[in-house]
Amino acid sequence: MYGRTRVSAALAASRPGEELVLKGWVRTVRVGKDVTFLAINDGSCMTSLQVVVEPALPNYQDVCRIGTGSAVAVRGILRESPAAGQKYELAAEELEIIGPADDSYPLQKKRHSFEYLRTIAHLRPRTNTFGAVFRVRSSLAQAVHRFFAERGFLYVHTPIITANDCEGAGELFRVTTLDMARPPLAAGEVDYSGDFFAQATGLTVSGQLEGELFAQAFSDIYTFGPTFRAENSNTARHAAEFWMIEPELAFADLMADAALAEDFLKFLCRHVLDNCGEDMAFFNEQIDKGLLERVRAVADSSFAVMEYTEAITHLKKAKVPFAFPVEWGLDLQSEHERYITEKVVGGPVFLVNYPKDIKAFYMRQNDDGKTVAAMDLLVPKVGEIIGGSQREERLDLLLERMAQMGINEDGLWWYLDSRRWGSCPHAGFGLGFERLLMYLTGMENIRDVIPFPRTPRHAEF
């Protein structure tokens, strides 16, 4: 049987009587007295197409013994279904069992816990929940590119292997060809001069610094790729490998940055509502009641702006026993962020102008000498979902800040060059793709929105 029709296309058809070839996997089998029903799914949509197999089929007895998970090809006639809840069914005229699956197949017809499904991550895309997750993930990734392409942004592929730690937190995964059982030493430290790159290198924690360089040549750019953090955090929100979206705008200040972030998040919310309806309805029904209402509210609302200092005032007045202290100069925790967005504002809010001592070296210093032009976008139920800043374009102040933080100029000479010649105000932000997916699907663990999660002590598959 050559060619095939996707299940999604067959279900959307309006031409009963048409002959179709369907190829996919058996989700369920019901053997009746005079007929057998197979539910076939090929991943193109949530819904399976029912295939009706009658005893006249030459290999009918083989079909009756077919196992859940088997790969099949079916040629048949599409017809209106008399059963409630389904528009069409396929009356089989020929059925080929391409790849059988026996009773040892782990995904039998029952509900499996997410914890168990993580142990068989190579098979979980075949379930309803994870089929929906990864269809939305794919559609959302395409929407990211479309948003920036429609606005004239250049897509930049920044390096995976790097010699710099953009965030300065020392959370790099080291990349080396040295024999670490007997590493060469110099003054008591590993000597990387004989290594592949002749210096210490690691996996990138962010493409921002390289993105800034391209923004000062192409004006508006974005990166979208994998990033890595050797952070030993075993939480539902942390992974060692994840994807980041990082736009950068030349000739822009903090509020222009915030305006782009608002447009971007609203665009993505509308995209999943308009283009992923079946999967989003599933999440709303099975995973997170009220999800659709919350996503629509973000898409339709105007985002507020609040100073960090004002947020601290609200938190200090709150009649809530926070687990973490609230003081000016301390970073906000998720409980604080959620209180601000849910109780004080009642919707999305940008917190702006944070104390400089809790932010990165590259953020532009404000005139008060105490704060930097940083912003975090907070949304209900999650807290921070986007973080960004205006970058420090003044070479003298950037050098001064690097010295205060003990950051070696020599390793960032190329970054500093961008401030020596033709420097201009610029700004950008970062959005963790998996955090976004968690927000838009209601999935509560980052391990469940990435195909093969990388977390402490786990790098299977």
Curated annotation (Swiss-Prot):
It comes from Geotalea uraniireducens (strain Rf4). It is found in: Cytoplasm. It comes from the Bacteria. One of its GO terms (biological process) is asparaginyl-tRNA aminoacylation. SUPFAM superfamilies: Class II aaRS and biotin synthetases, Nucleic acid-binding proteins. InterPro entries: Aa-tRNA-synt_II, aa-tRNA-synth_II, aa-tRNA-synth_II/BPL/LPL, Asn-tRNA-ligase, Asp/Asn-tRNA-synth_IIb, NA-bd_OB-fold, NA-bd_OB_tRNA. Belongs to the class-II aminoacyl-tRNA synthetase family. Its EC number is 6.1.1.22. Homodimer. GO terms for molecular function: asparagine-tRNA ligase activity; ATP binding; nucleic acid binding. GO terms for cellular component: cytoplasm. HAMAP family: Asn_tRNA_synth (MF_00534). It catalyses: tRNA(Asn) + L-asparagine + ATP = L-asparaginyl-tRNA(Asn) + AMP + diphosphate + H(+). CDD domains: AsxRS_core (cd00776), EcAsnRS_like_N (cd04318). Keywords: Aminoacyl-tRNA synthetase, ATP-binding, Cytoplasm, Ligase, Nucleotide-binding, Protein biosynthesis. Gene3D superfamilies: Bira Bifunctional Protein, Domain 2, Nucleic acid-binding proteins. This is Asparagine--tRNA ligase.
